[in-house]
């Protein structure tokens, strides 16, 4: 075996371990959400691939919904963050950083403090937290966005993010930008517009 071949084997082994670490973080997220008392699936008792009604008790309970694009954009942003902070490090290491951040958010988002904040400051009056299925899929959507961003030119990734924001903003009067704005600095005018 040559030195180059040994080096490639080490890189592949390290990448595999980092990907396993990503799965371990996701498993830990699932365990913590379970210990927090989150439901595995929608209280309705069935699973939908798509929940198209944003202002419903089924939102954030199924495989995907109008907030899935926000999690894809998280992946775009976390790829950029990893590129800045971990330049020269393996893609799998940057994905691990992104997975840790997203999983931490998914856990925080499902605490009573954040659920109550959503209900008091935003139009999400029917929001009672995510099902474990939905939260897991949100993290996988982030990973998908991360991998998309790793393959596309920056300009294309930015264009996709803007298109997703405009589309969801038009369709349901909510998106990642408005979600962050209303959580951090609620505005009555925005809340009234979102209420339709």
Curated annotation (Swiss-Prot):
Keywords: Cell membrane, Membrane, Transmembrane, Transmembrane helix. Its main location: membrane. The keyword Transmembrane helix applies. GO terms for cellular component: plasma membrane. The chain crosses the membrane at residues 16-36, 66-86, 152-172. It is found in: Cell membrane. It is a multi-pass membrane protein. Belongs to the UPF0314 family. HAMAP family: UPF0314. This is UPF0314 protein Smed_3089.
